[in-house]
Amino acid sequence: MESQQDFPHFLPGQEDGDSQRWGRGKRIGIIGGRGQMGRLFGRFFEAQGYQVVIADHDAGEGNEEIIRISDLVLFAVPLHETVSIIRDLIPYTRPEQLLMDLSSLKVGPIQEMLRSPSSIVGLHPMFGGSISSFAGQTMVACPARIDSREWSTMRQLFENQGMRIKECTPEKHDYMMSIIQVLFHVTTMVTGRVLRELAVDVAETMEFTSPSYRLEMNLLGRIFAQNPALYSAITQMNPFTRDVLDHLEAGLKRYKEWYNADDLSAFVSDFKRSAEHLGDFCGLAFEESSALLDFSVELARTRTEDRNQKTEGGNEKAEMRR
């Protein structure tokens, strides 16, 4: 999966290249520059002294023009459109350019960008476009074809703003995303489906809630409050999704068998085996999540008090009108 043949990383024989080729003052073209991530990174590069130009459906230059006039090109387009947009623009790319993308998957976009004569770095910010600071945020980087000194300069640009850069191959990235994103997104979406099919009144369940249930429901609601096309594409387009779904299906089938057989010991044994696999993380997670639960309870209490005060205020105004 991570052979040097599959992942060229640094171009051989280019160690003496000009590390300022894509430095401050250069022009970066952002395709998809009006989207949330496009705007975020547009502000980032502008603050670092770059000339930022954008292309989008309803603003800026055309995609081909952006490629023609830019020293660096950043693809910040919807995941399900990334590969086709890159493919259409490959004929306009040049050897002296740097191409980057921000998509949630890396194998497909990087394979397509490698068809160009340009230098290539795939990026995946592990955060959304609404953050207030880059400090402490993680961004995965796949420097697929680039001079080592030039990549070091670009990496430092991100790290100077507090980002943590994790390097890996495109294949390793997509495998890890099948766990970090696909596994947990699918289980969350299935939970939402079950709540819908059982016609569960979520507000009513909150009257019976435990702190952990409230926190889990907040995370579930957070997913469903976002773009369904993105979450669907992350699941559908990851090359490792099938394996994750197969294991989920097998696990649910096994749990159903144990339930039908009234085999409590099988549940207990399986629980213990998973806990052993997770090891010390269980204790650390318990401690960290306990702090989150305390905060969640306090937040819920404050919100309830605020709602009660608003209700009382409304009742007082109604009485005065009488």
Task: State the predicted function of each range.
Residues 2-65:
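NAD(P)+-binding Rossmann beta1-loop-alpha1 motif at the extreme N-terminus of oxidoreductases
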Residues 65-90:
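Rossmann-like NAD(P)-binding element
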